[in-house]
Structure formats: C-alpha cells, structure tokens
C-alpha cells in the first residue's frame, strides 16, 4: 500500500509538471506573438500637441525596451529548464545565475512603472485632445491616440507575463538547488 501511494503521488507530480510546462510553452507562444506585434508598432507622425507627442515617444521607448527584454527572458527560461527553444533537452546549457535573473527582474520592474505612468498620461492626453475640433488635426490625433492605446495594451500584457515568468524562474532557481 505504501509503494502504491508513492507511485500515485509520483504520477500526479509528473502529470502536474507536464501540465505546467505545456501551459508555460503556451504562454511563451503568446508572448512571442505579442513580441512580434510590438516590433511592428510604428510611431505616428508629430501632431503638434506636445503632451500627445511626448506620450508617443515614451510609448516607443518602452516598446523598444520590452522588445529587448522578451528574448533575454525566453533565453533564461530555456536555460533554466535545460532545453533548447525547440524543446530538445540540452545538458550542456549553463543554468542562469540568480544575479542575471535579478538584473532582468529590475528591468522588468522599471517597465511596469513606465507602463503605469504611460497609462495615466494617456488618460490626461485623451481628455486634453477631446476638446480639439480642427478637422485637419483630428486624423493625426486619432492615429496617435490609437497607437498609444494599442501599444500600452500590448506592453501591459507582455510586462505582466515577463514579471510572472522572471518570478517563477527566480523561485525555481533559488528553491531547487539549481544555482
């Protein structure tokens, strides 16, 4: 009976691990899709409204940083589980250090703060631009506001994923004697 309990427990652990890996790979795929969308974002032309132009420039800079973080995070993830991007086990891969992970976590935290600021700026800019009635300026304004909304939404989702992923990697490294 004792051996049977161990076998059942072990099988649940194996099934749980497989489920977590599958879910993580699915999340990584979604992250990759967001990453590609972020890379395709094009900063709109100047609108001559300083607050809106400043917002679009800041959104662009935040998008560049997010696009720089995503491949680094994916690399850390694959190194932490000892696999290549294709899912092939690789025993020669060097596990990431806790310092590497903490450095990336700091960058991700900074991104979180930037996105919170961008979100508050967006609401201010939206209120400010809603009073403009000049039909010649409206298309540029709408284009810039839509760009900011789309980008902030993508960046928000990606940053939440990045924060959770780095937290899990750090947790795995520090509790699993993987250092």
Locations of the language-model features?
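General helical structural elements
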Residues: 9-10, 38, 153
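C-terminal amphipathic alpha-helix
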Residues: 45-48, 52-55, 59, 66, ...
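Bacterial Sec-dependent N-terminal signal peptides
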Residues: 1-27
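A structural signal for well-ordered alpha-helices, especially hydrophobic packing surfaces
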Residues: 63-70, 74-77, 109-112, 116-119, ...
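Short E/K-rich amphipathic alpha-helical oligomerization segments
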Residues: 79-92, 120-142
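Immediate post-signal-peptide N-terminus of mature secreted/exported proteins
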Residues: 23-92, 175-179
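Mature extracytoplasmic domains of secretory-pathway proteins
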Residues: 93-125
């Amino acid at each position: 009976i004792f051996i049977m309990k161990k076998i059942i427990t072990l099988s649940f652990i194996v099934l749980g691990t497989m489920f977590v890996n599958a879910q993580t790979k699915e999340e990584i795929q979604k992250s990759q899709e967001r990453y590609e969308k972020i890379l395709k974002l094009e900063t709109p032309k100047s609108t001559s409204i300083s607050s809106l132009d400043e917002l679009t420039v800041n959104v662009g800079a935040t998008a560049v940083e997010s696009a720089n973080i995503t491949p680094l995070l994916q690399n850390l993830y694959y190194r932490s589980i000892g696999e290549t991007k294709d899912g092939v086990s690789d025993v020669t891969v060097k596990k990431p250090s806790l310092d590497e992970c903490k450095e990336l976590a700091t960058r991700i935290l900074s991104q979180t703060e930037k996105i919170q600021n961008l979100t508050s700026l967006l609401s201010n800019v939206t209120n400010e631009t809603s009073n403009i009635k000049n039909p010649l300026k409206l298309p540029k304004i709408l284009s810039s506001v839509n760009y900011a909304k789309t980008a902030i939404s993508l960046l928000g989702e990606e940053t939440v994923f990045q924060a959770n992923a780095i937290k899990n990697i750090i947790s795995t490294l520090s509790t699993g004697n993987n250092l």
